[in-house]
From Swiss-Prot:
Cofactor: Zn(2+)
Cofactor binding, per record: Binds 1 zinc ion per subunit.
Broad enzyme group: hydrolase
Transmembrane regions: 5-25, 34-54, 155-175, 193-213
Cellular component annotations (GO), alphabetically ordered: plasma membrane
Name recorded for this polypeptide: Protease HtpX
Species assigned in the record: Xanthomonas oryzae pv. oryzae (strain KACC10331 / KXO85)
Classification via HAMAP family: Pept_M48_protease_HtpX
Protein backbone atom coordinates (compact mmCIF):
# COMPACT_ATOMS: atom_id res chain seq x y z
CA UNK A 1 0.00 0.00 0.00
CA UNK A 2 2.72 2.47 1.01
CA UNK A 3 4.76 1.74 -2.12
CA UNK A 4 1.70 2.54 -4.22
CA UNK A 5 1.09 5.78 -2.32
CA UNK A 6 4.74 6.82 -2.69
CA UNK A 7 4.72 6.10 -6.43
CA UNK A 8 1.53 8.09 -7.02
CA UNK A 9 2.76 11.01 -4.93
CA UNK A 10 6.11 11.01 -6.73
CA UNK A 11 4.38 10.97 -10.10
CA UNK A 12 2.05 13.75 -9.05
CA UNK A 13 4.91 15.94 -7.79
CA UNK A 14 6.93 15.37 -10.97
CA UNK A 15 4.06 16.28 -13.26
CA UNK A 16 3.11 19.30 -11.15
CA UNK A 17 6.73 20.50 -11.29
CA UNK A 18 6.59 20.19 -15.07
CA UNK A 19 3.31 22.09 -15.07
CA UNK A 20 4.97 24.78 -12.97
CA UNK A 21 7.75 25.18 -15.53
CA UNK A 22 5.22 25.42 -18.36
CA UNK A 23 3.16 27.99 -16.48
CA UNK A 24 6.28 30.05 -15.79
CA UNK A 25 7.01 30.10 -19.52
CA UNK A 26 3.46 31.33 -20.04
CA UNK A 27 4.10 34.16 -17.61
CA UNK A 28 2.27 32.86 -14.56
CA UNK A 29 3.70 34.23 -11.30
CA UNK A 30 5.89 31.44 -9.78
CA UNK A 31 4.98 32.40 -6.19
CA UNK A 32 1.29 32.26 -6.97
CA UNK A 33 1.80 29.00 -8.82
CA UNK A 34 3.54 27.37 -5.85
CA UNK A 35 0.74 28.36 -3.51
CA UNK A 36 -1.84 27.12 -5.99
CA UNK A 37 -0.11 23.75 -6.33
CA UNK A 38 0.01 23.27 -2.56
CA UNK A 39 -3.61 24.30 -2.12
CA UNK A 40 -4.75 22.06 -4.98
CA UNK A 41 -2.87 19.05 -3.63
CA UNK A 42 -4.29 19.53 -0.13
CA UNK A 43 -7.86 19.77 -1.36
CA UNK A 44 -7.42 17.25 -4.18
CA UNK A 45 -5.95 14.48 -2.06
CA UNK A 46 -7.63 15.47 1.19
CA UNK A 47 -11.13 14.75 -0.02
CA UNK A 48 -10.12 11.45 -1.60
CA UNK A 49 -8.36 10.14 1.48
CA UNK A 50 -11.06 11.27 3.88
CA UNK A 51 -13.59 9.38 1.74
CA UNK A 52 -11.31 6.34 1.74
CA UNK A 53 -10.82 6.36 5.50
CA UNK A 54 -14.57 6.68 6.10
CA UNK A 55 -15.54 4.24 3.34
CA UNK A 56 -16.45 1.28 5.55
CA UNK A 57 -18.50 3.39 7.94
CA UNK A 58 -20.30 5.21 5.14
CA UNK A 59 -20.97 2.01 3.20
CA UNK A 60 -22.55 0.33 6.21
CA UNK A 61 -24.63 3.38 7.00
CA UNK A 62 -25.79 4.10 3.44
CA UNK A 63 -26.72 0.50 2.59
CA UNK A 64 -27.87 -0.62 6.03
CA UNK A 65 -25.47 -3.55 5.76
CA UNK A 66 -25.51 -5.86 8.77
CA UNK A 67 -22.13 -7.35 9.64
CA UNK A 68 -22.21 -11.06 10.42
CA UNK A 69 -20.48 -11.55 13.76
CA UNK A 70 -22.09 -14.84 14.74
CA UNK A 71 -23.73 -16.79 11.88
CA UNK A 72 -27.37 -17.52 12.57
CA UNK A 73 -28.21 -19.43 9.39
CA UNK A 74 -26.42 -21.94 7.15
CA UNK A 75 -26.15 -19.24 4.48
CA UNK A 76 -24.39 -16.83 6.82
CA UNK A 77 -22.07 -19.61 7.97
CA UNK A 78 -21.26 -20.44 4.34
CA UNK A 79 -20.58 -16.77 3.57
CA UNK A 80 -18.10 -16.47 6.43
CA UNK A 81 -16.33 -19.72 5.59
CA UNK A 82 -16.07 -18.87 1.89
CA UNK A 83 -14.72 -15.37 2.48
CA UNK A 84 -12.26 -16.69 5.07
CA UNK A 85 -10.96 -19.33 2.67
CA UNK A 86 -10.63 -16.89 -0.22
CA UNK A 87 -8.98 -14.22 1.94
CA UNK A 88 -6.36 -16.73 3.07
CA UNK A 89 -5.75 -17.79 -0.53
CA UNK A 90 -5.36 -14.14 -1.58
CA UNK A 91 -3.01 -13.38 1.32
CA UNK A 92 -5.14 -10.71 3.00
CA UNK A 93 -6.71 -10.33 6.42
CA UNK A 94 -10.22 -11.60 7.04
CA UNK A 95 -12.66 -8.86 5.93
CA UNK A 96 -15.89 -8.07 7.70
CA UNK A 97 -18.74 -9.86 5.95
CA UNK A 98 -22.14 -8.20 5.73
CA UNK A 99 -25.54 -8.57 4.08
CA UNK A 100 -27.62 -5.60 2.95
CA UNK A 101 -31.23 -5.45 1.85
CA UNK A 102 -31.40 -4.91 -1.90
CA UNK A 103 -33.46 -6.53 -4.67
CA UNK A 104 -30.68 -6.39 -7.27
CA UNK A 105 -27.97 -9.03 -7.63
CA UNK A 106 -24.91 -7.20 -6.38
CA UNK A 107 -22.06 -7.14 -3.89
CA UNK A 108 -19.29 -4.70 -3.04
CA UNK A 109 -16.01 -4.40 -1.18
CA UNK A 110 -14.54 -1.34 0.48
CA UNK A 111 -12.03 -0.27 3.10
CA UNK A 112 -8.80 1.69 3.40
CA UNK A 113 -6.69 -1.36 4.26
CA UNK A 114 -6.50 -4.72 2.50
CA UNK A 115 -6.28 -6.36 5.93
CA UNK A 116 -9.30 -4.52 7.34
CA UNK A 117 -11.87 -4.43 4.56
CA UNK A 118 -15.60 -5.03 4.20
CA UNK A 119 -17.29 -7.41 1.78
CA UNK A 120 -21.08 -7.16 1.52
CA UNK A 121 -23.66 -8.99 -0.57
CA UNK A 122 -27.26 -8.09 -1.33
CA UNK A 123 -30.24 -10.18 -0.30
CA UNK A 124 -31.11 -10.27 -4.00
CA UNK A 125 -27.82 -12.03 -4.75
CA UNK A 126 -28.47 -14.65 -2.08
CA UNK A 127 -31.97 -15.25 -3.46
CA UNK A 128 -31.12 -15.50 -7.17
CA UNK A 129 -27.61 -17.01 -7.32
CA UNK A 130 -26.56 -20.54 -6.46
CA UNK A 131 -23.53 -21.13 -4.25
CA UNK A 132 -21.10 -21.57 -7.14
CA UNK A 133 -22.12 -18.24 -8.65
CA UNK A 134 -22.08 -16.49 -5.27
CA UNK A 135 -18.63 -17.95 -4.55
CA UNK A 136 -17.33 -16.38 -7.76
CA UNK A 137 -18.83 -13.01 -6.85
CA UNK A 138 -17.16 -13.16 -3.44
CA UNK A 139 -13.89 -14.03 -5.18
CA UNK A 140 -14.29 -10.98 -7.42
CA UNK A 141 -14.71 -8.74 -4.38
CA UNK A 142 -11.79 -10.35 -2.53
CA UNK A 143 -9.68 -9.71 -5.64
CA UNK A 144 -10.57 -6.01 -5.45
CA UNK A 145 -9.32 -5.95 -1.86
CA UNK A 146 -6.17 -7.98 -2.60
CA UNK A 147 -5.32 -5.74 -5.58
CA UNK A 148 -5.60 -2.63 -3.42
CA UNK A 149 -8.14 -1.12 -5.79
CA UNK A 150 -9.71 1.15 -3.16
CA UNK A 151 -6.39 2.83 -2.36
CA UNK A 152 -5.40 3.04 -6.02
CA UNK A 153 -8.68 4.69 -6.98
CA UNK A 154 -8.36 7.18 -4.11
CA UNK A 155 -4.84 8.08 -5.24
CA UNK A 156 -5.92 8.43 -8.86
CA UNK A 157 -8.87 10.59 -7.86
CA UNK A 158 -6.55 12.75 -5.77
CA UNK A 159 -4.23 13.31 -8.73
CA UNK A 160 -7.16 14.12 -11.01
CA UNK A 161 -8.74 16.47 -8.46
CA UNK A 162 -5.43 18.30 -8.11
CA UNK A 163 -5.06 18.82 -11.83
CA UNK A 164 -8.65 19.97 -12.23
CA UNK A 165 -8.14 22.62 -9.53
CA UNK A 166 -4.80 23.79 -10.95
CA UNK A 167 -5.70 23.80 -14.64
CA UNK A 168 -9.05 25.51 -14.11
CA UNK A 169 -7.41 28.40 -12.26
CA UNK A 170 -4.38 28.71 -14.54
CA UNK A 171 -6.42 28.62 -17.74
CA UNK A 172 -9.05 30.84 -16.14
CA UNK A 173 -6.36 33.39 -15.26
CA UNK A 174 -4.98 33.36 -18.79
CA UNK A 175 -8.44 33.83 -20.31
CA UNK A 176 -9.32 36.56 -17.82
CA UNK A 177 -6.07 38.43 -18.52
CA UNK A 178 -6.54 38.12 -22.27
CA UNK A 179 -10.09 39.45 -22.07
CA UNK A 180 -9.33 42.29 -19.63
CA UNK A 181 -6.01 43.13 -21.28
CA UNK A 182 -4.43 43.82 -17.87
CA UNK A 183 -2.57 41.20 -15.82
CA UNK A 184 -2.24 43.47 -12.80
CA UNK A 185 -5.83 44.57 -12.41
CA UNK A 186 -6.72 41.70 -10.07
CA UNK A 187 -9.31 39.00 -10.47
CA UNK A 188 -12.77 40.11 -11.40
CA UNK A 189 -16.10 38.35 -11.07
CA UNK A 190 -15.70 36.96 -14.60
CA UNK A 191 -12.59 35.05 -13.51
CA UNK A 192 -14.54 33.05 -10.93
CA UNK A 193 -17.28 32.29 -13.44
CA UNK A 194 -14.65 31.06 -15.91
CA UNK A 195 -12.98 28.91 -13.25
CA UNK A 196 -16.32 27.39 -12.25
CA UNK A 197 -17.13 26.47 -15.86
CA UNK A 198 -13.63 25.08 -16.46
CA UNK A 199 -13.82 22.97 -13.31
CA UNK A 200 -17.02 21.42 -14.63
CA UNK A 201 -15.44 20.72 -18.03
CA UNK A 202 -12.12 19.42 -16.70
CA UNK A 203 -13.96 17.48 -14.01
CA UNK A 204 -15.94 15.69 -16.70
CA UNK A 205 -12.75 14.61 -18.46
CA UNK A 206 -11.24 13.58 -15.11
CA UNK A 207 -14.27 11.39 -14.45
CA UNK A 208 -13.84 9.76 -17.85
CA UNK A 209 -10.22 8.92 -17.00
CA UNK A 210 -11.16 7.53 -13.58
CA UNK A 211 -13.94 5.40 -15.06
CA UNK A 212 -11.65 4.10 -17.81
CA UNK A 213 -9.26 2.93 -15.12
CA UNK A 214 -12.15 1.46 -13.13
CA UNK A 215 -13.23 -0.61 -16.12
CA UNK A 216 -9.68 -1.99 -16.45
CA UNK A 217 -9.82 -2.97 -12.77
CA UNK A 218 -12.98 -4.96 -13.31
CA UNK A 219 -11.32 -7.25 -15.83
CA UNK A 220 -8.52 -7.85 -13.34
CA UNK A 221 -10.98 -8.53 -10.51
CA UNK A 222 -12.87 -10.98 -12.74
CA UNK A 223 -9.58 -12.79 -13.38
CA UNK A 224 -8.91 -12.82 -9.64
CA UNK A 225 -12.38 -14.18 -8.94
CA UNK A 226 -11.81 -16.89 -11.54
CA UNK A 227 -8.54 -17.83 -9.86
CA UNK A 228 -10.15 -18.06 -6.42
CA UNK A 229 -13.42 -19.76 -7.38
CA UNK A 230 -12.86 -21.19 -10.85
CA UNK A 231 -13.28 -19.70 -14.30
CA UNK A 232 -16.50 -21.58 -15.08
CA UNK A 233 -18.08 -20.28 -11.87
CA UNK A 234 -17.01 -16.71 -12.65
CA UNK A 235 -18.46 -16.93 -16.15
CA UNK A 236 -21.69 -18.43 -14.79
CA UNK A 237 -21.99 -15.59 -12.26
CA UNK A 238 -21.59 -12.93 -14.94
CA UNK A 239 -24.08 -14.72 -17.18
CA UNK A 240 -26.56 -14.74 -14.31
CA UNK A 241 -26.01 -11.01 -13.89
CA UNK A 242 -26.65 -10.43 -17.59
CA UNK A 243 -29.99 -12.25 -17.32
CA UNK A 244 -31.09 -10.43 -14.16
CA UNK A 245 -29.50 -7.04 -14.71
CA UNK A 246 -31.60 -4.46 -12.90
CA UNK A 247 -31.11 -0.94 -11.66
CA UNK A 248 -27.98 -0.45 -9.56
CA UNK A 249 -29.16 0.87 -6.20
CA UNK A 250 -25.74 0.91 -4.53
CA UNK A 251 -24.65 4.30 -3.14
CA UNK A 252 -22.32 6.18 -5.48
CA UNK A 253 -19.31 5.83 -3.17
CA UNK A 254 -19.26 2.03 -3.50
CA UNK A 255 -20.74 1.50 -6.99
CA UNK A 256 -17.29 1.25 -8.57
CA UNK A 257 -16.47 -1.72 -6.33
CA UNK A 258 -19.66 -3.67 -6.93
CA UNK A 259 -19.85 -6.78 -9.09
CA UNK A 260 -22.32 -5.07 -11.41
CA UNK A 261 -22.45 -1.53 -12.76
CA UNK A 262 -24.78 0.46 -14.96
CA UNK A 263 -25.44 0.06 -18.64
CA UNK A 264 -25.16 2.59 -21.43
CA UNK A 265 -24.14 3.25 -25.01
CA UNK A 266 -22.28 5.99 -26.82
CA UNK A 267 -20.91 8.79 -24.68
CA UNK A 268 -22.64 7.47 -21.56
CA UNK A 269 -20.45 4.38 -21.74
CA UNK A 270 -17.39 6.58 -21.08
CA UNK A 271 -18.78 7.36 -17.62
CA UNK A 272 -19.52 3.76 -16.58
CA UNK A 273 -17.41 2.15 -13.85
CA UNK A 274 -17.90 -1.37 -15.26
CA UNK A 275 -17.41 -2.78 -18.77
CA UNK A 276 -20.39 -4.45 -20.47
CA UNK A 277 -21.00 -7.93 -19.07
CA UNK A 278 -20.61 -9.41 -22.56
CA UNK A 279 -17.05 -8.06 -22.76
CA UNK A 280 -16.20 -9.38 -19.31
CA UNK A 281 -17.52 -12.84 -20.18
CA UNK A 282 -15.63 -12.81 -23.48
CA UNK A 283 -12.40 -11.86 -21.70
CA UNK A 284 -12.76 -14.79 -19.31
CA UNK A 285 -13.52 -17.21 -22.14
CA UNK A 286 -10.49 -15.97 -24.07
CA UNK A 287 -8.12 -16.27 -21.11
CA UNK A 288 -6.01 -19.40 -20.93
CA UNK A 289 -5.50 -21.42 -17.77
CA UNK A 290 -2.17 -19.85 -16.81
CA UNK A 291 -3.61 -16.34 -17.00
CA UNK A 292 -6.23 -17.19 -14.45
Amino acid sequence: MFNRIFLFLLTNVAVLMLAGVVMSVLGVNPAQMSGLLVMAAIFGFGGSFISLLLSKFMAKRSTGAQVITEPRTPTERWLLETVRRQAQAAGIGMPEVAVYDGPEINAFATGANRNNALVAVSTGLLQHMDQDEAEAVLGHEIAHVANGDMVTMALLQGVLNTFVIVLARVVGGIIDSAVSGNRDSGRGFAYYIIVFVLEMVFGMFATMIAMWFSRRREFRADAGGAQLAGRSKMIAALERLSLNHGQNTLPSQVQAFGISGGVGDGLRRLFLSHPPLTERIAALRAANGTAM
